[in-house]
Design a protein with these regions (language model features):
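Short, low-complexity N-terminal intrinsically disordered segments enriched in polar/charged residues
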Residues: 1-35, 40
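Short beta-strand segments enriched in hydrophobic/aromatic residues
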Residues: 33-34, 95-97, 127-128
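Residue-level signal for tight coil/turn positions that link beta-strands
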Residues: 86-88, 118
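Short beta-strand edge/turn micro-motifs at domain boundaries
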Residues: 105-131
Length: 131
């Protein structure tokens, strides 16, 4: 990826985002986000000022998802650039959550806003239909 490839940067950070989520690595997951970070899901707006603010919610969410739904992993169904500029990309995404036996928990469309901060691409905001 080069500075001239904003969509490539957005894809790389969203790969790291999902890989760290699947590994239940909250610290690595938090490192893929820009702060302050906005998440709109389950009818709630969450604003995390920094990684220390996000980590407890991420750890709790990962644990609850495993216990409540039997979640094992998630996969991207698609990631499509809606708009792309030199420092910001809007992605139309959808992911599916799976149980260990491969059965589907649900499909969740979302919009992600990816920004470049210095030489890094990070997820600044997410609006999804995921619980």
């Amino acid at each position: 990826m080069t500075d001239d490839d904003p969509v490539g940067g957005a894809m790389a950070v969203t790969d790291a985002f999902l890989d760290s989520f699947n590994a239940c690595d909250a610290a690595a997951h938090a490192a893929t986000l820009a702060y302050p970070h906005v998440r709109l899901a389950s009818g709630r707006l969450r604003l995390w000022q920094d990684a220390a603010d996000a980590l407890p919610a991420m750890e709790q969410g990962m644990t609850a998802l495993r216990e409540r739904a039997g979640w094992h992993h998630s996969e991207w169904d698609h990631r499509r650039a809606i708009h792309a500029g030199p420092a910001k990309v809007h992605l139309d995404v959808q992911f599916t959550r799976y149980r260990e036996d491969g059965s589907v928990i649900g499909h969740y469309p979302a919009v992600y806003v990816i920004v470049r901060e210095g030489d890094r691409w990070l997820i600044a905001a997410r609006s999804s239909f995921a619980p």
